[in-house]
């Protein structure tokens, strides 16, 4: 097998888009203002003791420096019921949370309603990785809904088929 050796950013984006992933919204309320980012790089099960998850964020992000200051971050793994939420929270214009139902905690974590999984977390460690930060989060609480997750593959959102009972 011969491999393509082109490693420029545009080519890599297309190649990496072939890996299906869930999408997480990482949000908090700081001084009365809702802030958040979305990450298709979100990964669970990094560690069970302590309970750690992780995601990667571009160093050029304008939102991460604000979110980094939150005591607690709400991680919402988006479900098929959250259509359009990812694009809206990732938007650079307007009110990123207009029309999005959210629930907050006393510690400032902010969750997107109707998601498939919610985790309340705090920053455990942050590691420089090229043009990104890899952020490890310690999980302090969790809840699941039973909704099917939204899947990001080939730069498009997909839903899993509903399992049929035999």
PLM features: residue spans?
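Basic, polyanion-binding surface patches
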Residues: 1-166
């Amino acid at each position: 097998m011969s491999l393509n050796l082109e490693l420029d950013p545009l080519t890599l984006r297309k190649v990496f888009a072939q890996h299906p992933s869930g999408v997480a919204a990482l949000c908090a309320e700081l001084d009365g203002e809702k802030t958040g980012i979305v990450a298709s790089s979100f990964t669970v099960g990094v560690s069970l003791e302590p309970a750690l998850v992780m995601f990667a964020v571009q160093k050029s992000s304008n939102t991460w420096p604000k979110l980094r200051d939150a005591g607690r971050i709400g991680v919402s793994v988006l479900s098929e019921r959250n259509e359009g939420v990812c694009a809206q929270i990732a938007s650079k214009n307007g009110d990123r949370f207009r029309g999005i139902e959210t629930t907050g905690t006393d510690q400032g974590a902010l969750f997107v309603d109707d998601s498939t999984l919610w985790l309340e977390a705090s920053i455990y460690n942050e590691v420089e990785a090229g043009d990104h930060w890899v952020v490890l989060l310690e999980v302090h609480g969790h809840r699941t809904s039973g909704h099917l997750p939204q899947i990001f593959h080939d730069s498009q959102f997909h839903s899993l088929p509903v399992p049929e009972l035999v």
